[in-house]
């Protein structure tokens, strides 16, 4: 019982967070030496840092054709948009679904569908609020093109935010990916854009809470029309 309770709160941590947690812990020790109340503030910040870099196990649906959310967060935009030019996917608009991550969300990014990475392109840029429309065009970003088994392509774009200053991408051209497989993360608040193939409708709604690697975002085999929703 106690172990189950602990596992609810204690999750694995992404290796990217090790140095940050160590720095916070050292600063906390110094703060305790200066003044105990400051030390307890440091403890709180250290716990938050660990929580930010958590990397929990996710149960990913494995049926062929399902596209899952690449990030934890909230669906902030659903609109037609041309994928990043640096991916070379052409000028035709695709349906773009944006998932905004705040500083309390898990920031590990996962592949929305299995396939082979055909392009990885980093572009420096601004650090506007990631929830804004123009963040897709103006902010620092790292874009991936993934070719599916049937030859179609999707794009996944990691976008830095107002606080984020570090995009981590752990794959390169030619890397095979499984649906829900980890491929990177963004530190301290950001956004993920997914560009769906032509004719594929999103099965999520604006404002919907997403769980990376688990929430079904779209289905390549479904004739269902785009979903609508209401807050209740």
UniProtKB/Swiss-Prot annotation:
Keyword DNA repair: no
Residues where Pyruvic acid (Ser) is found: 190
UniProt cofactor note: Binds 1 pyruvoyl group covalently per subunit.
Catalysis: reaction(s): a 1,2-diacyl-sn-glycero-3-phospho-L-serine + H(+) = a 1,2-diacyl-sn-glycero-3-phosphoethanolamine + CO2
Entry membrane topology: Peripheral membrane protein
Entry keyword annotation includes Cell membrane: yes
Cofactor (UniProt): pyruvate
EC number(s) per entry: 4.1.1.65
InterPro entries xrefs: PS_Dcarbxylase (IPR003817), PSD-A (IPR033175)
Keyword field: Cell membrane, Decarboxylase, Lipid biosynthesis, Lipid metabolism, Lyase, Membrane, Phospholipid biosynthesis, Phospholipid metabolism, Pyruvate, Zymogen
Example of a GO biological process term: phosphatidylethanolamine biosynthetic process
Biological pathway: Phospholipid metabolism; phosphatidylethanolamine biosynthesis; phosphatidylethanolamine from CDP-diacylglycerol: step 2/2
GO terms for cellular component: plasma membrane
Localization of this protein: Cell membrane
Molecular function terms from GO: phosphatidylserine decarboxylase activity
Site feature: Cleavage (non-hydrolytic): 189-190
Major enzyme class: lyase
Record: active site: 190
Subunit composition and interactions: Heterodimer of a large membrane-associated beta subunit and a small pyruvoyl-containing alpha subunit.
Family the UniProt entry places it in: Belongs to the phosphatidylserine decarboxylase family. PSD-A subfamily.
Function: Catalyzes the formation of phosphatidylethanolamine (PtdEtn) from phosphatidylserine (PtdSer).
The protein, known as: Phosphatidylserine decarboxylase proenzyme
Annotated organism of origin: Cereibacter sphaeroides (strain ATCC 17029 / ATH 2.4.9) (Rhodobacter sphaeroides)
